């Protein structure tokens, strides 16, 4: 067994090849499915088992093309809005969460709803409602148009201002500088979010933090693993779809952490052989909505190109499991 060595970041270790010139893959651990994604995907699968197709799903259940395609083949029908769902039918809300207006629209059509919102997103929704009840200005750090941001803002539309990047800080206006709090989208870059928070705090010294971290444990863990291996990587390949915020952030983290290059791929066929020219060490990770089968496909493709040594870079162990929505627990 190759030796285990310190990777230079607390808690990170890797089995590193004795010959540093041999082509190798550093494989980030943890990677792939988080507890919220696992719960959401299983929710649709169990709903199909219990009720039979079609089961309607508002928006992509998670941001991954492979997952959506697989569920479509099983009988899931993905729609943009609830008015596309036949009255009285079953509809699943995606892991990203929805605004109260969506619940109301579903009720008007007598839809049978199953809410697959990630519990960590629900936590942010609850925070938004609580601070709005106390008449705070809520500065929501996130990406404009992202489903999660739309849902969270919809919980308190009269109190929430979106802060999309450091440049947006200068445009923020509040009513009372003593009653300002920041919340965030759960899938952001930790470093970028903290940069925005510090800039906000320069403007509003009494800015309050959320009661607990809004950026989810899985997002943070995957970014830490990428940071651990990035300095040793000529190239980092992130498996994930382009509309997946947390996957895109992993590319940014890899580049910021010292990787020579970083690319986002949906699957192995997206790998450009030119990326591998002159490369000795390739880092591989995947976003929180990516099934492991897609990572294995990438590893097989890299092995065909001579990268047949795979060494883990482990920074955390994940054991969290979320209970399924009560509407479909009996289907287990």
UniProtKB/Swiss-Prot annotation:
It catalyses: isopentenyl diphosphate + 2 oxidized [2Fe-2S]-[ferredoxin] + H2O = (2E)-4-hydroxy-3-methylbut-2-enyl diphosphate + 2 reduced [2Fe-2S]-[ferredoxin] + 2 H(+); dimethylallyl diphosphate + 2 oxidized [2Fe-2S]-[ferredoxin] + H2O = (2E)-4-hydroxy-3-methylbut-2-enyl diphosphate + 2 reduced [2Fe-2S]-[ferredoxin] + 2 H(+). (2E)-4-hydroxy-3-methylbut-2-enyl diphosphate binds at residues 63, 96, 146, 186, 244-246, 289. GO terms for molecular function: 4 iron, 4 sulfur cluster binding; 4-hydroxy-3-methylbut-2-enyl diphosphate reductase activity; metal ion binding. Dimethylallyl diphosphate binds at residues 63, 96, 146, 244-246, 289. The active site is at residue 148. One of its GO terms (biological process) is isopentenyl diphosphate biosynthetic process, methylerythritol 4-phosphate pathway. [4Fe-4S] cluster binds at residues 34, 118, 216. It comes from the Bacteria. Keywords: 4Fe-4S, Iron, Iron-sulfur, Isoprene biosynthesis, Metal-binding, Oxidoreductase. Pathway: Isoprenoid biosynthesis; dimethylallyl diphosphate biosynthesis; dimethylallyl diphosphate from (2E)-4-hydroxy-3-methylbutenyl diphosphate: step 1/1; Isoprenoid biosynthesis; isopentenyl diphosphate biosynthesis via DXP pathway; isopentenyl diphosphate from 1-deoxy-D-xylulose 5-phosphate: step 6/6. The keyword Metal-binding applies. Coiled coil: none annotated. Its EC number is 1.17.7.4. Pfam families: LYTB (PF02401). It is an enzyme of class 1 (oxidoreductase). Isopentenyl diphosphate binds at residues 63, 96, 146, 244-246, 289. Its cofactor is [4Fe-4S] cluster. Binds 1 [4Fe-4S] cluster per subunit. PANTHER family: 4-HYDROXY-3-METHYLBUT-2-ENYL DIPHOSPHATE REDUCTASE. HAMAP family: IspH. Belongs to the IspH family. Catalyzes the conversion of 1-hydroxy-2-methyl-2-(E)-butenyl 4-diphosphate (HMBPP) into a mixture of isopentenyl diphosphate (IPP) and dimethylallyl diphosphate (DMAPP). Acts in the terminal step of the DOXP/MEP pathway for isoprenoid precursor biosynthesis. This is 4-hydroxy-3-methylbut-2-enyl diphosphate reductase. It comes from Mycolicibacterium paratuberculosis (strain ATCC BAA-968 / K-10). The gene is ispH.
């Amino acid at each position: 067994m190759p030796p285990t060595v310190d990777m230079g970041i607390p808690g990170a270790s890797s089995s590193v090849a004795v010959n540093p010139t041999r082509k190798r893959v550093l494989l980030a651990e943890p990677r792939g499915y988080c507890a919220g994604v696992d719960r959401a995907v299983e929710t649709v699968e169990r709903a199909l088992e219990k009720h039979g197709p079609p089961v309607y799903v508002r928006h992509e259940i998670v941001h991954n093309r492979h997952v959506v395609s697989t569920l479509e083949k099983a009988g899931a029908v993905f729609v943009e809005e609830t008015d596309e769902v036949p009255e009285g039918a079953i509809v699943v809300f995606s892991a990203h969460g929805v605004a109260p207006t969506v619940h109301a629209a579903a009720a008007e059509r007598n839809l049978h709803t199953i809410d697959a919102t990630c519990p960590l997103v629900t936590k942010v929704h609850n925070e938004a409602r609580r601070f709005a009840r106390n008449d705070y200005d809520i500065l929501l750090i996130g990406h404009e148009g992202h489903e999660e941001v739309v849902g969270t803002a919809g919980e308190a539309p009269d109190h929430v201002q979106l802060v999309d990047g450091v440049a947006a800080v200068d445009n923020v206006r509040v009513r009372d500088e003593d009653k300002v709090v920041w919340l965030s989208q759960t899938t952001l870059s930790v470093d970028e979010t903290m940069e925005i928070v510090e800039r906000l705090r320069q403007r509003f010294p009494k800015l309050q933090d959320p009661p607990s971290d809004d950026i989810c444990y899985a997002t943070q863990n995957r970014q830490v693993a990428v940071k651990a291996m990035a300095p040793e990587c000529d190239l980092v390949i992130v498996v994930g779809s382009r509309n997946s915020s947390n996957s895109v952030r992993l590319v940014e983290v890899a580049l910021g952490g010292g990787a020579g290059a970083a690319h986002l791929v949906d699957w192995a066929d997206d790998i450009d052989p030119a990326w591998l020219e002159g490369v000795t060490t390739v880092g591989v990770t995947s976003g929180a909505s990516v099934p492991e089968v897609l990572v294995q496909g990438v590893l097989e493709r890299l092995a065909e190109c001579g990268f047949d040594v795979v060494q883990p870079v482990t920074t955390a162990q994940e054991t969290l499991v979320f209970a399924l929505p009560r509407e479909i627990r009996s289907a287990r």
